[in-house]
A protein has these predicted regions:
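Terminal domain-start leader segments
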Residues: 1-329
Length: 329
């Protein structure tokens, strides 16, 4: 299928749903900067393979935004695609909300997959479109209906990171996070950023190239935790670590139904710049949202003595490799 044929198929799906605009960002369900093959929907639809970009498809036009690293590449790859290149930061180039506002009608419908856009991103766009009285349609992945040979989600097993490398147990990390939750009077903490979960749970994986994480979600309560992950990817050490720390394992996609069960009188700590729109939309509207960065962000930035020593060892190995690659024969 050519890019033009893909766009035509997408527009047919949009027409069935009375959508004026459909947005395809470069993201996965966890707001990860670099995404795995399954999540390269923008690349599939546009033909542009750079690591950063956003595609907006309207009834009779389409545009792609990217930054200065990719202007030359994007101009070349978008030839004959009918997609206009929007060079971010250049004078006269509209922002994404401005472009949507121009091409969406009054009382129109704005579509996207709610799992690949973070909550704050959606709010910021809708704030700029409030005069148009827009309806959001975020329940379906339209690209997935077109992408017949889409790569599957990764299934390779991860591994438990021993304390001789992490320097701190999962038990102690969860206790520290619960202390911060108490300060905020939070009953629940939703964590969706993969690096944070990897640090908290002392686990690593191979789900994204050059980024040792596993696709999963984590919900921490006052007494127990819930992790949402492909169970086949867990080894015995990881299962034992979860059991020791009262971590209940659920299927990866069950997060969306699980958050519906959080009671209305709960107080949920989460970061709207990271947690995807579909998750927050499934929360009871009476829940008090505490919007702030994950406590683990600052915690993992403060390296303990074991981590510092391991960093030194890693730097020595890197230095030797660099010298070997640059020395003269």
């Amino acid at each position: 299928m050519t890019v033009v044929e893909k766009l035509n198929k997408l527009r047919a799906l949009m027409k069935e749903r009375k959508m004026d605009v459909y947005m395809i960002p470069t993201s996965d369900f966890h707001e990860t900067e670099y995404v795995g093959e399954h999540f390269k929907a923008r690349s599939f639809m546009s033909g542009f393979t750079g690591s950063a970009g956003t595609l907006i498809v309207c009834k009779d036009c389409a545009a792609l935004w990217t930054d200065g690293r990719y202007f030359i590449q994007a101009a070349d790859q978008l030839k004959d695609s009918t997609i206009d290149l929007m060079k971010q930061g250049e004078e006269g180039v509209p922002s994404i909300p401005e472009y949507i506002n121009e091409h969406i009608q009054m009382n129109g419908v704005f579509g996207f997959d709610g799992r690949v856009m973070n909550t704050k991103q959606v709010k910021d766009i809708m704030d700029q479109l409030k005069d148009k009285h827009i309806t959001i349609c975020a329940q379906e992945d339209l690209v997935g209906m077109i992408w017949e040979e889409r790569p599957a989600l990764p299934t390779e097993k991860g591994f438990f990171l021993e304390e001789k490398y992490s320097g701190k147990s999962t038990k102690d990390k969860l206790a520290d996070i619960r202390d911060v939750m108490k300060e905020h009077k939070a009953t629940h903490h939703i964590v969706t950023s993969l690096d944070d979960i990897a640090w908290i749970m002392n686990m690593r994986g191979w789900d994204i190239s050059c980024f040792p994480v596993m696709l999963c979600y984590l919900v921490i309560t006052e007494k127990e935790s819930h992790i949402f992950i492909n169970k086949d990817k867990l080894d015995e050490r990881m299962h034992a670590n979860f059991k020791d720390n009262m971590v209940i394992v659920h299927a990866y996609d069950d997060i969306y139904e699980f958050v519906k069960t959080i009671p209305a009188d709960a107080a949920v700590l989460l970061h709207t710049s990271v947690v995807n729109y579909a998750i927050t939309q499934n929360l009871n509207k009476e829940i008090r949202i505490i919007d702030c960065p994950n406590p683990s962000q600052l915690m993992k930035a403060r390296k303990n003595e074991i981590e510092l020593e391991n960093n030194r060892k890693a730097h020595i190995k890197d230095a030797v490799a660099t010298l070997d690659s640059t020395r003269h024969p």
